[in-house]
């Protein structure tokens, strides 16, 4: 079962805001539950691996009562870590990803894991997606420590263009379910609070941030300037966390995006700049980023969006480059030190190259 090129099928099974409670523990992922959601008798559900991160990924092998049906490997994604599910906004994140696979994935032509079920409930507040286990099919996953070749990054930004064109011009009022979750902005401000900042940048293991970016107040001001309401016409539904660590690569080398947990309406350049800068080496980014932005814009137009040229969006790209500074604030509980340092180096170099801070705080000459 290869990754689908047009999302899930129009007949995706699932239910949003069901009054039937969804499982909150791995032990509740039973054969009777799979029988219920899949609509075919499941004889056994064997847990192969449990991976607990921001969301839990539970890999299982399903065997069916009908011997003619071959066993199936699936990945169940949702909130199955009790240490996290007690945090209300974490459940909101899981629900948001389920909403994406239910509402949006069937409508867009981009590589996505085939989805067997997507649901949310109003009892536990859980959000669950049951998808194909890509790992068992030979897929690999993006590693922030390993930059990508330019052609693969081009393929990825063209996929983002297809996503963006599908909801071009949308506002939070147009997609209300995508605005009812935890704010990334609140999370960043928490990480930039005085005590957290001091802890993050104390000692020799601090992220490789240039000295002029060590002014906490100035960096917070730049974030707030980036988040100010604008008259940008580049708004639509965005991935929100489009970095190399949230990708898969098929056995034939085709990339795709995963982890749709913070989708929201915002500027397309949030996704485009964040992905390009984090996925390429600094040298390749400097040599190719304008061409990649133009490739994105060309695909956006072919997919039904407006006809735009790089010069029309370049300042927006430069502004949203600053979002990558959030990597410097990521704690060891969020990402490994090696990944934080690698991504911080790439993003800070771009912030300097594009004079993003000066542009945001109004001091650019």
Q: What residue spans do the PLM features occupy?
A:
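ATP-dependent phospho-/nucleotidyl transfer catalytic cores
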Residues: 2-8, 15, 139-239, 251, ...
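Conserved ATP-binding subdomain of kinase catalytic cores across diverse folds
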Residues: 48-190, 268
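Flavin-dependent oxidoreductase catalytic core characteristic
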Residues: 135-138, 142-147, 226-230, 242-243, ...
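Generic recognition of stable, solvent-exposed alpha-helical segments in well-folded globular domains
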Residues: 151, 155-158, 237, 242, ...
